[in-house]
C-alpha cells in the first residue's frame, strides 16, 4: 500500500533527505488523481526541480526519505524475478506430480520464458547502471579523501583556524559516510541480482514422465531384440 496523500502533503515545504542521510531537497508539490492516488512527488534542490515516483518516497517515523532511482528500479526487478522463480518452481512441481497435462505445461512454460527474457534484459541494463554509479561513488570518495588530507595539512601548518577546520572536516566526514553507505548498498544489490538470477531455473520435463518414456522405449527395444528361430534345412545325403 502506498503512502496516504494526507500524510505526504504534511511535508510540503519541508526539507527531506535521501536514505543515506544526504539532503534531497524540498517537497514543493504532490501530484494526485481524483481518488487521492499519488502519481508523483516534486522536489526542489538548488536550481533544479525533479519529480519522483511514489515508489521512491518512504515515510520513516516522523520524516520522509527519498530512494535513489537505481534502488527503486532494483526493488522492482528483484520483485519480478522472485515472482518468476516461484512460478517456475510451482509449475515444475505440478508437472512432476502429473497434475497438469503436457500441453498446459508447455504453454505456461513458454509464457514464463517470454516474461523472463524481458526481465533479464532489464536486469542486464540495471546492473550496468549500478556499476556506473559505483564508479562515480568511488571517484567522489577519492576526491573527498584528497580534500580531507589537504585540509589537515592546512590546519597543521596553521593556515586555517581550528573551528573552520572542525566544521569542514565534519561536513566531509558525513559526506564520505553517506557515499560509503550507498556504495555498500549497491554492492549488496548486485549480489542479490546475481544470486536471484542463478536461482531462476530452466524448467525440465518431469523425471517421472521421462522415466516412463525411457521405460517404454526400452520395452520397444527389448521386443526388437527377441531371438528369432534360425531356419534349418536338412539335406538328405543318402
Curated annotation (Swiss-Prot):
It is a peripheral membrane protein. The keyword ATP-binding does not apply. Changing residue 232 to D: Loss of interaction with CdvB. One of its GO terms (cellular component) is plasma membrane. Disulfide bonds: none annotated. Keywords: Cell cycle, Cell division, Cell membrane, Cytoplasm, Membrane. The keyword Cell cycle applies. It is found in: Cytoplasm, Nucleoid; Cell membrane. GO terms for biological process: cell division. Its main location: cytoplasm. Induction: Induced around the genome segregation and cell division stages. Down-regulated after UV irradiation, indicating division inhibition in response to DNA damage. The C-terminal 18 residues mediate the interaction with the wH-like region of CdvB. Part of a cell division machinery. The CdvA, CdvB and CdvC proteins polymerize between segregating nucleoids and persist throughout cell division, forming a successively smaller structure during constriction. CdvA is a membrane interacting protein that recruits ESCRT-III homologs to the membrane. Interacts with CdvB. This is Cell division protein A. It comes from Sulfolobus acidocaldarius (strain ATCC 33909 / DSM 639 / JCM 8929 / NBRC 15157 / NCIMB 11770). The lineage of its organism: Archaea, Thermoproteota, Thermoprotei, Sulfolobales, Sulfolobaceae. The gene is cdvA.
